[in-house]
């Protein structure tokens, strides 16, 4: 999340001076606001997996479409992981206030299209509602680019069955993005104990990834359904850096295409204040 030796990123808000932000907002009114989590990811992956992944994708996408990438907002909504040490969660009320304040700040500075880029399933329902609130209560319009889009990419990459947490997909992503943080010797397939109705819905997920939200909504505490904190029916040992690069490139391209389609549908940028 913070590499002291990384080169300056001209689209990443923490790297910019205020005059540089001023110049950027006169070219574009799009800001990408990424959301991750600080929560357990099984015995082999870092607790910051969601955060590390989404900020890398959001930054790469912002460079492709000439948008501002705000810093990731974390921790987030992870109460279902609290039986595992290291997880930090916010209440829904606190999370909503933080999101609304961040979006209001960006809108005030002239970023009138705010993309909520979500990298954690536990945030999805709240962010869908908050995108609506941002549009109604601030000067900006907001859309959510969320987990359904990621699921479509997983299926294209032939990720096995239900693989939503610390499985093949996220292991691959971390092996590509942050291999030094992966404890490969501790990778193991969990014993899963999902409710029968969720098991039955898995067949539908193969055809329509957006249905995954109905499996994960109201999910019991993770320690009750997984032996090690991973939520997958696949084998994390199948994760590879090559597959991680494939997922990363596809996710960046999908996010960039989403922003460009939004621009095409809604017209040119709104001039920034004083611009």
Regions found by a protein language model. Name each.
Residues 1-80, 85-93, 97-113, 121-275:
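Extended, histidine- and acidic-residue-enriched regions that form the cofactor-binding/catalytic faces
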């Amino acid at each position: 999340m913070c590499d002291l030796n990384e080169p300056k990123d001209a689209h990443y808000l923490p790297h910019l001076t205020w005059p540089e932000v001023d110049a950027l907002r006169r070219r574009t009114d799009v800001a990408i606001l990424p959301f991750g989590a600080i929560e357990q990811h099984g015995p082999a992956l870092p607790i910051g997996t969601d955060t590390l992944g989404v900020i890398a994708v959001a930054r790469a996408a912002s460079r492709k479409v000439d948008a501002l990438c705000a810093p990731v907002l974390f921790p987030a909504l992870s109460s279902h992981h609290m039986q595992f040490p290291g997880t930090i969660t916010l209440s829904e009320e606190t999370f909503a206030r933080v999101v609304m304040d961040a979006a209001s700040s960006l809108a005030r500075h002239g970023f009138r299209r705010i993309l909520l880029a979500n990298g954690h399933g536990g945030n999805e329902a709240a962010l869908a509602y908050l995108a609506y609130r941002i549009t109604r209560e601030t000067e900006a319009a907001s859309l959510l680019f969320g987990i359904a889009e990621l699921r479509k990419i997983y299926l294209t990459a032939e990720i096995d069955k239900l693989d939503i947490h610390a499985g093949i997909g996220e292991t691959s992503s971390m092996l590509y993005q942050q291999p030094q943080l992966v404890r490969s010797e501790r990778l193991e397939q969990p014993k899963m104990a999902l409710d029968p109705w969720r098991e039955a819905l898995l067949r539908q997920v193969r055809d329509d990834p957006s249905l995954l939200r109905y499996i994960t909504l109201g999910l019991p505490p993770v320690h009750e359904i997984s032996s090690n904190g991973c939520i997958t029916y696949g084998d994390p040992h199948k994760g590879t850096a090559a597959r991680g690069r494939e997922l990363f490139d596809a996710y960046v391209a999908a996010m960039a295409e989403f922003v460009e389609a939004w621009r095409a549908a809604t017209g040119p940028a709104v001039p920034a204040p004083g611009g």
